[in-house]
Swiss-Prot record:
Residues 75-90, 113-122, 361-382, 414-434 have a biased composition (Polar residues). Residues 1-178, 209-450 are annotated as: Disordered. It comes from Dictyostelium discoideum. This is Putative uncharacterized protein DDB_G0284695. It comes from the Eukaryota. Residues 24-43, 60-74, 124-163, 233-253, 290-303, 311-324, 336-355, 392-405, 435-450 have a biased composition (Low complexity).
Length: 450
């Protein structure tokens, strides 16, 4: 492949076997420039070069066509790349001058990019022979270009085959340097037939990559485990990628720790949130056993058990850790007395027993046998007893018998409810009747019930 422009730089990818022919052509062109129309072959060579730069209607179209055909298959370059600097096309930069150029006595040598005087001389000396030679040379050059293109295509095909073999079966981006044809590690510079090789950087140095390289920057140290470092020498990272992908696939399949299978747990009876084995609606149908542990760590009946079995005792532990009847048991047991829900160790009547209350029973508080009021340790009447007795103690903290609305008609005289001081050493009759008027005045007082 060749790159041609007005600056005079020709980048040619050629094999080493073509170096001799190339050097001869370069010498002929340079000698023709120095001698200025000495022979027709060199004249036509220089003339063709300038016409390639300025004649857009003829040669540039052919050159662009050839260049486009060669550019369609750009492949990595050969190890050696040659650059031909023609004397008439090199700029006046002193770094491009060789010792032979500086010591040359030929006054016709010019280092300007465009030698207009030489070009005018060649144009004035055109003749039929030169035109014929020019046509022949153009044909030869076209044939050579076609041959070079064919060789480049063959080389490109070989390179493609080699690259396909290397990357076969790999689904990852490899850190590989793919250089463009105009960039190579070693350049061969030819100035007036003198060759000089320049090595840009070492072959093993990967610090500088070509402009068209496909590579990623190296990652920082101590990176997370799921990020791997780029390896420029081997494919170990590919195995790491595959292993990571396999691990992710295993997690997605519902393995231990995976989000798809973490909730399955046991079958039939699963561990609920209280770490106790019991039935849960998520288990589906309840287990055969009618009784199981509920969520309160106490074995008892649960609505999920369905109807209690005949073998199951009618009484079972409720949720308060006390054995008693529960509405979930259905009909109360035959016993008219059972323990209530107040965690009391005293048997008493409960509305759930149905029917009328027994003649005497304990109330819902921890009291002695018999019936008594709720706030005192004294026996008293309760609405659950039915009709009140003829006389009873009131509900106030008095140790004295007195009238109560529940007694019906009040007695002729009674003590009031105001806790007035009285002589506790006297008998009740002495306190109730006016035998001691002074004491009675201190104790007896009017009451609305009078």
């Amino acid at each position: 492949m060749s790159y041609s422009n007005t600056s005079g730089y020709n980048f040619n990818n050629r094999n080493d076997s073509d170096n001799d022919e190339e050097n001869n052509n370069s010498n002929n062109i340079n000698n023709g420039n120095n001698r200025n129309n000495e022979n027709n072959e060199n004249n036509e060579s220089l003339k063709r070069k300038f016409e390639e730069s300025f004649d857009e209607d003829e040669n540039n179209n052919n050159i662009n066509t050839n260049n486009n055909s060669s550019n369609s298959n750009i492949q990595p370059p050969s190890k050696r790349q040659e650059i031909n600097y023609n004397v008439n096309d090199i700029s006046n930069d002193s770094s491009y001058h060789s010792d032979e150029e500086e010591n040359s006595s030929d006054s016709d040598v010019s280092l300007n990019k465009t030698n207009n005087s030489t070009f005018e001389n060649f144009k004035n000396n055109k003749n039929n022979n030169n035109n014929n030679n020019n046509n022949n040379n153009n044909n030869n050059n076209n044939n050579n270009n076609n041959n070079n293109n064919n060789n480049n295509n063959n080389n490109n095909n070989n390179n493609n085959n080699n690259n396909n073999k290397e990357e076969e079966g790999e689904n990852f981006i490899e850190s590989r340097t793919v250089s463009s044809p105009e960039i190579s590690n070693t350049y061969v510079i030819t100035i007036n037939g003198n060759k000089k090789e320049i090595e840009l950087y070492g072959k093993d140095d990967t610090t500088y990559n070509s402009q068209s390289s496909v590579s990623l920057p190296p990652l920082v140290d101590n990176a997370p485990p799921h990020i791997h470092h780029i390896d420029f020498n081997n494919n170990n990272n590919n195995n790491n990628n595959n292993n990571n992908n396999n691990n992710n696939n295993n997690n997605n399949r519902g393995g231990r720790g995976g989000y798809r299978g973490g909730h399955r747990g046991g079958r039939g009876a699963s561990n609920n949130y209280n770490r106790n084995q019991q039935w849960h609606p998520s288990d589906g149908t309840p287990p055969p056993q009618q009784q199981h542990q509920n969520r309160n760590n106490n074995q008892q009946w649960h609505p999920s058990d369905g109807t209690p079995s005949p073998q199951q005792q009618q009484q079972h532990q409720n949720r308060n850790n006390n054995q008693q009847w529960h509405p979930s048991d259905g009909t109360p047991p035959p016993s008219s007395s059972h323990q209530n829900r107040n965690n009391n160790n005293n048997q008493q009547w409960h509305p759930s027993d149905g029917g009328s209350p027994p003649p005497s029973h304990q109330n819902k508080y921890q009291n002695n046998p018999g019936y008594q009021k709720r706030n005192n340790n004294q026996q008293q009447w309760h609405p659950s007893d039915g009709t009140p007795p003829p006389s009873h103690q009131n509900r106030n903290n008095h140790q004295q018998q007195q009238w109560h609305p529940s007694d019906g008609t009040p007695p002729p005289s009674h003590q009031n409810r105001n806790n007035q001081p009285f002589n506790r050493n006297l008998s009740p009759n002495q306190n109730r009747y006016p035998q001691n008027q002074q004491k009675m005045q201190q104790q007896q007082q009017p009451h609305p019930s009078d």
